[in-house]
Amino acid sequence: MKRPIIGMLALCSSVIAMGETVDVKTLEYTGPYPVQMPLMFDSVDVNSRKFDVKSLLDTHVSQATLRNPEIFSGDVAPGSDDAYALHLLGFTVENRHYAKASLNVKGLKNYNVYVDGRKLEGNQLVLTPATHKITVMYLSEKGKSDSIKVSLDSEHPELLKVGTGTSRMYTLDDVLHGTRISSTSISPDGKYMITSYYHTRKGGAYEYVYRISDVAAGNVVAETSDAIKWMPKGSRYYYTRNTNDGRVLYAVDVATGRRDLIASDIPNEWFTISPDESYLIITSVQSGPKESPDVYEIIQPEDRQPGWRDRYMLAKYDLATGVQQPITFGHNSVSLSDISDDSKKLLVRTSRSRLTSRPTTLTSLYVIDLATMTSTPVVEDDGFISGAMFLPDATKVLVSGSPESLDGVGRNLPEGRTPSMVDEQLYLINIVDRKVTPLTKEFDPNIQQHVWSRADNMIYFTAENRDMYSLYRLNPANGDITMIPVPEDLVKGISLPDAGRTMAWFGQGASNSDRLYKLDTKTLKSTLLDDPVKEQLK
């Protein structure tokens, strides 16, 4: 009795090993697409091969042709009255787990199979979790017809869902590839906005594009691959270009399209245009001492980082004369934080190392008067500030930093407990008497981007609110903070004009990628302007 049972088990195992067949009974059809035989100038090609009719299958057919298919469920493949024609039959395979299958196409004489747009060699399918598009391209001849039967063999057919249509799963490819928003910036007069997009293709290659749109109408008025930014006044944008005569700076008026040459032969270094558009502040690099090839030398731990020994200094480039003069000199780097609205003062920061105690890096803020070339200290040797900007009248400075910054004036924890160094808060410092006013001492969320609005004298900022980046408005006159309701969970970037009541911002939600909006700062209502991945996710 044991032998028959063992034999039956072996038979069952062989059946399971062979897998089960899933017939594809409904297909999407597009065609026919007539193709012609090429003109024969020679009997063989450069590889001494004669022409083969099957090579017509290598004719490129755009995937866009599959957008309006017909439903086909017959046993005989559609033909054509043309001598030769190409036809496309397609279906989808959806699998939520990794799966393997064998694709069988019977009856057709000349055909190729494409999986997600790539030609399949052989008939073995290795399917990652996704909705896959299978396309059979076949060649028909006049007066001849082929039968057609398509099926899948799989050991786990329950993992495969065969169908037609355009609906598909959201997969990792949708996260890694496609178009995203990098930044947005509204013009000083509030009429236009520049939005930077980056598009990532399969394989990792990417490209940037900059679109200028009309804020009121919402339509795109210009597009370029040049990295463009707004001039400090009006609605002109600028960009640089390298020529035989050096690096040149152009400005373009969005409304008229007029392009003006602002400067020629400017240094090939980072720069900031002054608010009155009369000069550039150049950040120049001074190379540090080189390490001896015979000695492996590390001055301090950070010396292991490339470029640590280099220093950054500031210089002023006069756009009228083309003369560049140094603004700062010294052993430690100096960086630009802001320029006053009247272009007469610079807010700069410098840092130095102190490895003997915490914090190990100390930062100082200074106001430089460009007329007298004198400096006024605002903050000295603080290890916890991270950024600073002038107020519009340049009498005060808005500083961001942890609760330990500025002698702990923003600290609200019990004695003996150390605040988080990444808990960013905001402070106002009077330049004359250096009096510090903490603005967000009792505000819990960690502040991210912040902008002082010259239009209504409010501070708009984003903050890390639990698992969201929320948008807020702070009234510096009374300290009131209002959370602005927006339709996205993560507000990734904001921009405000010098005049007007429109804010440009972009963000994403739990179920969608980046979207671009404009917000009325009086009504606090947001209007959707662009959803760059909407078509991709259809």
Across the structure, where does each feature detected by a protein language model lie?
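Short loop/turn segments that connect beta-strands within beta-propeller blades
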Residues: 214-217, 253-257, 318-322, 369-373, ...
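Accessory carbohydrate-binding/adhesion or oligomerization-edge regions at the termini
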Residues: 20-75, 133-172
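Aromatic-lined ligand-binding clefts that engage carbohydrates, nucleic acids, or primary amines
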Residues: 95, 99-112, 134
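A flexible loop/linker signature enriched in serine peptidases of the S9 family
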Residues: 178, 197-209, 240-250, 263-269, ...
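A short beta-strand motif characteristic of beta-propeller blades
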Residues: 170-176, 217-223, 258-263, 323-328, ...
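Blade-loop segments of beta-propeller domains
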Residues: 217-247, 264-270
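Blade-terminus and WD-like Trp-Asp/Gly-His loop motifs, strongest in beta-propeller folds
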Residues: 128, 184-192, 228-237, 271-279, ...
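Serine-hydrolase catalytic core recognition
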Residues: 493-538
